[in-house]
Amino acid sequence: MQKLILLSIVLILISCSGKGQNKTMKNKTMTDTTKVISRTEEEWKKILTPEQYHVLRQKGTDLPFTGKYYLNKEKGMYACAACGNELFSSDMKFDSECGWPSFDKEIAGGKIKKIKDYSYGMVRTEIICAKCGSHLGHLFDDGPTLTGMRYCVNSTSVDFKKK
């Protein structure tokens, strides 16, 4: 069972690793007036489900093609599942065929921070909620839209608010 989980993780990382990861990303800071949330890990454990805690706080990853928002085509807003910070509009979503919800840009206002991630022997850009510091997914520069960006987001990391 552990070998299957390890194999799944390796395949997930390979499929999301993208190409051309040598571009540098600058960390963006939050520019709107939203107050930053600071909680202990014990407080997060009480607020979040075990699955949410694993993904949002321990930087876990949904299995590909299993997330509830992967194929969602409804109009609305995607917000951080931990704090409600609005991150993406459905107009920013596209089908990247990578197995996770993908967006080509974020809502303005510095609501997402970008951090270099050196885990698993790769260099990637992790995206976290600027309001609460929760893990959302990773950012790649292989998107097919005009921005060239692909925000690869875990369904567990977001809630969807239908318009």
For each feature predicted by the language model, list its residue ranges:
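Sec-dependent signal peptide cleavage junction
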Residues: 17-46
